Amino acid sequence: MHNDKDFDQWNEEKKVLHADAERLFFHEREIWYCHLGNNIGFEQDGRGELFLRPVVIIRKFNNEIFWCVPLTRTLKDLPFYFAFAMHVDTETSNEQSAAVLSQIRLIDAKRLRRLVGYISEKDFALLKKKLKALLP
């Protein structure tokens, strides 16, 4: 079996993240670049040297942990994908994105890198409704 993922590089980055005492302040509905890392099988990976991927924060439990859903630019018409216009806090007003609902994860705030934007209240309500529909 061919394995082209660099788990060793991700492990080194994870050690740095773990040792970092800083946790950034975040809110539900925000979209952040997050160090998701190199993962197993079909789990969503981060990209680049820092293993980053945008995520939308679904549920904040406290200042340390939250549920998030990874985002992709690949739009698929499947029940576990939710397409929406991401509102970016920079010069770009809207960017099409899709939340991969089946990949919901509990994340420590140490993994957060940079605030990118947010999802509208209307789209956030629809996203949560679609997430709940996936439960048995």
Residue spans for each PLM region:
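Loop/turn positions that initiate beta-strands
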Residues: E28-R29
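Short, charged beta-turn/beta-strand-edge "cap" motif at the junction between a beta-strand
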Residues: G37-F42
